[in-house]
Amino acid sequence: EVLREGSIEKLNFPLKKRQYLAPRSQYDIRPTYFIYGGLVFQPLSRNYLETWDNWWEKAPSEFLFLYRAGVRSEARQQIICLDQVLADELNVGYEGYDNATIKSVNDIEPRDMSHFASILESAEGVVHIRTSDEVSIMLDTREVKEGAERILSRYQIPCDRSANLADVKS
């Protein structure tokens, strides 16, 4: 009930459950990841944040803000993070660009990890990955495809993507 112009009115309105952009703690679920040109990407989640000791103080401030305040929308279902760079001749110069969120790939804003992987898989020529702090990462798609097995073998990684992204192929 509310008071409007001297009279009491009853109001009804639906309350929707908040759809967080970054999932809270998840159990019995393997992490989602995608490796492209030695760059390891994964969605922002509480499980990912917990890889930092005292994560609420030590995780990147952008990650913490998005975890606390980010709300899902039709256009954005997940935050894609560049987790780390597996050193290789393909990605020389990009070693320090880990722990960043992805803004776009070839000027397309990815909705989620599946969409992100499909954009990269279908790209031709040079891929332009832009982070939220406007860092540009440029990779030649032919060189990425040629170097994929070398990188996975060097780091003893069985697959370039998690099982839930196995259907995303070029």
Task: Identify the function of each model-found stretch.
Residues 1-170:
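C-terminal recognition in membrane/secretory proteostasis and scaffolding
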